């Protein structure tokens, strides 16, 4: 444990690559131009009306932004700064690259410490992950972070280059992958103390906008989740079960809601609202485990301002939090098990797609097998930069899951991508041309009015005057229409300009003399949004504190979200345009003052409420009270600034003439300042490089000193060994020889034991063959008995039918005799002799005595004899019916016994299939086991047992030999049961050995490892893992346990 933990503390020295790239980037910082026309603003904002676009999974990376962020290495190379410096080039750049893979270890949890888990995987340096118990098993990645690393460190390496390149027109995607409870959601979202990748990326986006003058930006966000293969819109609770569509640009989600964001707090408020609708649940590892994949998409549109405008650059930044794959260790049931099966299927499909892409062959890639892979199709197919963050746990209890995650990351590292910049070529370049033509025409018109054009005759002037009068009527109507259109256009410009974000850096107060009035007000409105952000960051001390305050406002106080949004939209900047202001602009400032006054009143009431509540919990409420007081002071300062602007607006018109000269001087000073800052940045970068080189030299010097000391110690040890007597060497060699002899003896004993076991198994197999032959003979005898019983049943049935016919006839005759006895008069004399003769003649047919007409009167029927004969027939009929019922009962018992024998036969087949797998393993360990004449003893044993059961039951059903049946059972049972018991005991021992050899075998191994519903029914080849049901084994192309390709499958019947 101590050795493994010490290995995690190693870190790589900072790379100078990022510092140089940052220096190149700052070279292209230019002052912002405020001469953007109204028509260009309309066209740039018109991109909002386009259809909803889904996150395009493409990625971009580049160096770090700003002059103060040096020494952070980029895991993969990115487009050069010279290419990124000219975003409006008609040629689209592309560069062959690979997916950036970063691995982050989380520390052991308290539960894992209590359970006694040890460190099974550890980071070996900055790029290697190595197994503790098998050091030869290692994986190399772009960057590996130990448990002590912070989320900011991970963001600087894995996500910051992607975010920066996305702001320059290259699509980017960052997603976290790992098993459940490995720290994916913590890495992507974080908390108040340690923000995650998504909050840091949002903050970085707005800081890049601040540092990029001369460009205007439009930001939109969308937030969706994939829950049980159903896409839901987290920003719109009514948007459920959305569909995925495809067009020329790639895949997108139809009907997804997109929101325009104006500040980091605004964007974080949408994330907080979406997280309230996300599906979470608890399991054995995590109290709040993610049950769905989420995709947060930031769409960026940017264009250059002023005369340099050439088109619009569009890019998408996708930040994905995948749900963790689950094993049977989570012990989920019901809905949680169903959710886990959907998560595992989507992640298994993602692994299959990554595997096929890593092969580089022209094969079918199953993107459509899952909603996740279909949405990631454009990213994985290589149209942008991709950054994969794999979160793993070092615990020994999850060693196999960690190994699978590392295999997945290693495959993803080999996928090639081609990052390219997106560009929207629209009609804006034509609008610029038209505007230049209009300006030249206006110049000519001014020259005509001043009479600067000579050589025009009186006749030409009269004709021109006549044409002018004719066109006045038409122009009047057109002018009215244009006025109406202009009013509508102005209102639309004011609305759309509020959504466009620009930088306030290097903006000069009052530099708006050549800009139209409405354009000046729009630019001021855009400046206000970001000036307020700068003021907040200056007051709070650092950008991180600003982000924490904004996230607190969006998460902790929902009632303040609307007021914060209004403050972001309407708060004035410290550098508001101070030129000649129109009454509309002054009214706008007055309205902003009123809104600020209302927000101050609302914040004051909130502060009073918090002060009242702080009596119960003063510690937690103290920070909120301080933040509110700071916010109230800031808004009061902004309101005073607005009032000062209103007062100074009148004075600005007087000093307008001299202000232009001052602005030119300030501009020249600003350019000089930029040059000096650039030189200073280069000097600081060189200084950092020299410091890094000095540190490297120092470390090399220390290593050389350590090597010298080590060599001196070895030299002393060698000299002492040479001086020691040779008897010690002999003693050591003798001890070593004794140890070798003991090992050889123990191995010989083990070999003898294995040979004895082998002989016993062969004897047991021969005994089982003999029993199979006996049981086969008994089965044939049982079949003969069954056929004889069937023939006898048929005979009995025919006899019963005959007896029933005779019974009906006798009943009819008895009824006729009774009728005759009632009609006849009683006779006085009885002839005894005749009666005896009549009784002897009744054994024949009675109808024959009725044939003689002359003796009919002398006929006398005895009803008692008839009753006795009828009773005898009834008794015989009852006996036959009871015999038939007994036969049917015996036949039912035979059927039940046959079904039970079939069930036992199936159970024996499964047991013997497992036994033969174990026998095959024994063959590999102890040598080839001789095959018994091409016969299958397992199959014979099953048949023999089933035949024995049939024979026992048939013999037991025989009515004449009950004693023989008991003797047969008692004789056969002692012969069979010991052999079967020995076989079962041997199989149980082999199973226990196999379970002990596997360090992390699943407790519920009889359940499918993908769907967690059906029992396992397939043995996968060549890995021989019995872990999937029949349907999942046909659907999967690789084993979910060891990730090896499935070449064939053996299906078994569950017992």
Curated annotation (Swiss-Prot):
One of its GO terms (molecular function) is ATP binding. InterPro entries: Kinesin-like_fam, Kinesin_motor_CS, Kinesin_motor_dom, Kinesin_motor_dom_sf, P-loop_NTPase, Znf_RING, Znf_RING/FYVE/PHD. It is found in: Mitochondrion. One of its GO terms (cellular component) is mitochondrion. It holds the Pfam family zf-C3HC4_3. Residues 419-503, 618-653, 694-823, 880-911 form a coiled coil. Residues 98-415 form the Kinesin motor domain. Residues 1-36, 826-856, 926-963 are annotated as: Disordered. Keywords: ATP-binding, Coiled coil, Metal-binding, Microtubule, Mitochondrion, Motor protein, Nucleotide-binding, Transit peptide, Zinc, Zinc-finger. GO terms for biological process: microtubule-based movement; regulation of defense response. Belongs to the TRAFAC class myosin-kinesin ATPase superfamily. Kinesin family. KIN-7 subfamily. This is Kinesin-like protein KIN-7D, mitochondrial. It comes from Arabidopsis thaliana (Mouse-ear cress). The gene is KIN7D.
């Amino acid at each position: 444990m101590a050795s493994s933990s010490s290995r995690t503390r190693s870190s790589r020295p900072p790379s100078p690559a990022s510092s140089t790239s940052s220096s190149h980037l700052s070279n292209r910082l230019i002052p912002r131009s405020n001469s953007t026309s109204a028509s260009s603003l309309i066209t740039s904002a018109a991109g909002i009306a386009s259809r909803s676009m889904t996150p395009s999974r493409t990625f971009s990376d580049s160096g770090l932004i700003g002059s103060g962020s040096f020494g952070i290495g980029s895991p993969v190379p990115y487009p050069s700064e010279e290419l990124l410096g000219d975003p409006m080039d008609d040629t689209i750049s592309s560069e062959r690259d690979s997916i950036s893979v970063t691995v982050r270890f989380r520390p052991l949890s308290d539960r894992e410490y209590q359970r006694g888990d040890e460190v099974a995987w550890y980071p070996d340096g900055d790029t290697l992950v190595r197994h503790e118990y098998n050091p030869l098993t290692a994986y190399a990645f772009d960057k590996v972070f130990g448990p002590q690393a912070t989320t900011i460190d991970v963001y600087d390496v894995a996500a910051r280059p992607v975010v920066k390149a996305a702001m320059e027109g290259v699509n980017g995607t960052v997603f976290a992958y790992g098993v459940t409870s490995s720290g994916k959601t913590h890495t992507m979202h974080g908390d108040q103390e340690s923000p995650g990748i998504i909050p840091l990326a949002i903050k970085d986006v707005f800081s890049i906008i601040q540092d990029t003058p001369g460009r205007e930006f439009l930001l939109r966000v969308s937030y969706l989740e994939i829950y049980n293969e159903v896409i839901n819109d987290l920003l719109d609770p009514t948007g459920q079960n959305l569909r995925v569509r495809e067009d020329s640009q790639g895949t997108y989600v139809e009907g997804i809601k997109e929101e325009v964001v104006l500040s980091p707090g605004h964007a974080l408020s949408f994330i907080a609202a979406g997280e309230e609708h996300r599906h979470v649940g608890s399991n054995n590892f995590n109290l709040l485990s993610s049950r769905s994949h989420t995709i947060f998409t930031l769409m960026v549109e940017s264009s250059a301002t002023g005369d340099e405008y050439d088109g619009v650059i569009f890019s998408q930044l996708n930040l994905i939090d995948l749900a963790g794959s689950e094993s049977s260790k989570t012990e989920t049931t019901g809905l949680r098990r169903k959710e886990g099966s959907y998560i595992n299927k989507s992640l298994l499909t993602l692994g299959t797609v990554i595997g096929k892409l890593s092969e580089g062959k022209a094969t079918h890639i199953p993107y459509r097998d899952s909603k996740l892979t279909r949405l990631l199709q454009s990213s994985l197919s290589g149209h942008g930069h991709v950054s994969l963050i794999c979160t793993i746990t070092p615990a020994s209890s999850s060693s196999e899951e960690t190994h699978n995650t590392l295999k997945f990351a290693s495959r993803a590292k080999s996928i090639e991508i081609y990052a390219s910049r997106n560009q929207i070529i629209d009609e804006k370049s034509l609008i610029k041309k038209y505007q230049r033509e209009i300006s030249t025409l206006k110049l000519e018109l001014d020259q005509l009015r001043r009479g600067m054009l000579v050589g025009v005759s009186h006749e030409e002037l009269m004709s021109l005057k006549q044409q002018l009068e004719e066109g006045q009527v038409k122009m009047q109507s057109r002018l009215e229409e244009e006025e109406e259109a202009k009013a509508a256009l102005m209102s639309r410009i004011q609305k759309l300009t509020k959504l466009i974000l620009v930088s306030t850096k290097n903006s000069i107060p009052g530099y708006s003399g050549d800009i139209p009035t409405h354009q000046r007000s729009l630019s001021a409105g855009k400046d206000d949004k970001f000036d307020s952000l700068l003021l907040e960051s200056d007051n709070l001390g650092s950008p991180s504190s600003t982000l924490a305050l904004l996230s607190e406002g969006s998460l902790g106080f929902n009632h303040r979200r609307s007021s914060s949004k209004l403050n972001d939209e309407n708060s004035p900047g410290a550098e508001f345009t101070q030129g000649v202001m129109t009454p509309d602009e002054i009214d706008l400032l007055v309205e902003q003052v009123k809104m600020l006054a209302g927000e101050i009143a609302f914040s004051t009431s909130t502060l009073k409420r918090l002060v009242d509540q702080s009596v119960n919990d003063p510690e937690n409420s103290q920070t909120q009270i301080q933040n509110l007081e700071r916010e109230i002071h800031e808004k009061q300062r902004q309101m005073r600034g607005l009032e000062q602007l209103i007062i100074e607006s009148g004075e600005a018109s007087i000093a307008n003439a001299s202000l232009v000269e001052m602005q030119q001087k300030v501009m020249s000073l600003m350019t000089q300042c930029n040059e000096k800052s650039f030189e200073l940045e280069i000097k600081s970068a060189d200084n950092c490089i020299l410091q890094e080189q000095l540190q490297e030299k120092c470390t090399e010097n220390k290593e050389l000193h350590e090597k010298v000391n080590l060599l001196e110690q070895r030299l002393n040890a060698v000299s002492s060994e040479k001086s020691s007597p040779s008897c010690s060497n002999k003693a050591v060699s003798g001890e070593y020889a004794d140890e070798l002899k003991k090992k050889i003896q123990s191995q010989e004993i083990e070999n003898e034991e294995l040979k004895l076991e082998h002989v016993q198994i062969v004897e047991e197999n021969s005994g089982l063959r003999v029993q199979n032959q006996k049981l086969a003979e008994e089965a044939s005898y049982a079949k003969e008995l069954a056929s004889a019983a069937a023939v006898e049943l048929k005979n009995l049935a025919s006899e019963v039918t005959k007896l029933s016919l005779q019974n009906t006839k006798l009943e009819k005759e008895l009824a006729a005799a009774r009728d005759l006895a009632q009609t006849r008069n009683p006779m006085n004399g009885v002839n005894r002799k005749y009666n005896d003769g009549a009784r002897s003649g009744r054994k024949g047919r009675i109808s024959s005595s009725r044939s003689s007409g002359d003796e009919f009167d002398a006929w006398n029927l005895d009803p008692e004899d008839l009753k006795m004969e009828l009773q005898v027939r009834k008794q015989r009929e009852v006996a036959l019916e009871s015999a038939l019922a007994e036969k049917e009962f015996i036949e039912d018992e035979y059927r039940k016994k046959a079904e039970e024998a079939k069930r036992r036969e199936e159970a024996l087949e499964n047991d013997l299939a497992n036994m033969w797998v174990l026998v095959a393993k024994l063959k590999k360990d102890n040598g080839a086991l001789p095959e018994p004449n091409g016969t299958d003893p397992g199959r014979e044993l099953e048949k023999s047992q089933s035949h024995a059961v049939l024979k026992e039951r048939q013999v037991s059903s025989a009515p004449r030999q009950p004693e023989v049946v008991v003797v047969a059972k008692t004789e056969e049972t002692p012969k069979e049961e010991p052999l079967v018991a020995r076989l079962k005991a041997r199989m149980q021992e082999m199973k226990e050995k196999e379970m002990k050899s596997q360090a992390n075998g699943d407790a519920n191994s009889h359940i499918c490892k993908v769907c967690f519903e059906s029992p396992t029914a397939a043995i996968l080849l060549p890995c021989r893992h019995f872990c999937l049901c029949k349907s999942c084994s046909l659907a999967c192309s690789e084993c979910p346990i060891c990730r090896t390709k499935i070449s064939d499958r053996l299906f078994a019947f569950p017992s």
